[in-house]
């Protein structure tokens, strides 16, 4: 569980296999929407043969610290692969940082720690610059 029983859980309404609605009653906030998306993805990962999921840093930014901690615990419980990309690990709680440090496979940073050794969005010396 992400929250105790005082919070409303996300709901999925299926309509004859042609469409669906996925929402959290009375909460249309961005953080709640992204948290619900993560829970949905984890449910699909657990209940299907899908071997892995990936979550980008964008979906974590508006989720509070306590729910992020619980999401990290759920990630740890999975027997399947989960790939996540996070910016600014210092922005997360000590619990989440600890989980990330124990389980990280790859750390990327500026200054030589980029994938393939360089930043793709910067001009090199042959391209000129300001």
Task: Please provide the spans of the model-predicted regions.
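C-terminal lobe/lid and adjacent interdomain/linker elements of RecA-like ASCE P-loop ATPase modules
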Residues: 68-130
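Conserved NTPase motor "head" modules and their coupling/switch loops across ABC/AAA+ ATPases, GTPases
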Residues: 1-31, 47-49, 129
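Active-site-adjacent loop/helix micro-motif of nuclease/hydrolase catalytic cores
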Residues: 29-34, 62-66
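Conserved P-loop NTPase "ATPase switch" module shared by AAA+ and STAND
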Residues: 48-63
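GG-anchored amphipathic helix commonly corresponding to the ABC/SMC/Rad50 NBD signature/C-loop
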Residues: 31-52
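Hydrophobic, Leu/Ile/Phe/Ala-enriched alpha-helical segments that form helix-helix packing faces
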Residues: 1-2, 40-43, 75, 96
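Charged, polyampholytic interaction/assembly segments that form long, compositionally biased interfaces
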Residues: 43-47, 66-72
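Conserved beta-strand segments of the P-loop GTPase G domain that flank and frequently precede/overlap
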Residues: 23, 54-56, 83-85
């Amino acid at each position: 569980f992400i929250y105790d029983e005082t919070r409303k859980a996300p709901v999925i309404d299926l309509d004859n296999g042609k469409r669906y609605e996925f929402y959290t009653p009375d909460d249309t906030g961005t953080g709640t929407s992204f948290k619900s998306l993560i829970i949905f993805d984890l449910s699909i990962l657990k209940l299907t043969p899908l071997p892995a999921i990936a979550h980008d840093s964008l979906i974590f930014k508006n989720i509070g610290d306590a729910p992020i901690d619980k999401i990290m615990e759920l990630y740890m419980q999975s027997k399947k692969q989960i790939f996540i990309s996070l910016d600014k690990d210092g922005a997360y709680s000590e619990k989440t940082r600890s989980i990330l440090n124990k389980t990280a496979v790859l750390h990327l940073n500026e200054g030589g720690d980029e994938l393939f050794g360089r930043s793709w969005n910067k001009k090199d010396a042959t391209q000129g610059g300001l």
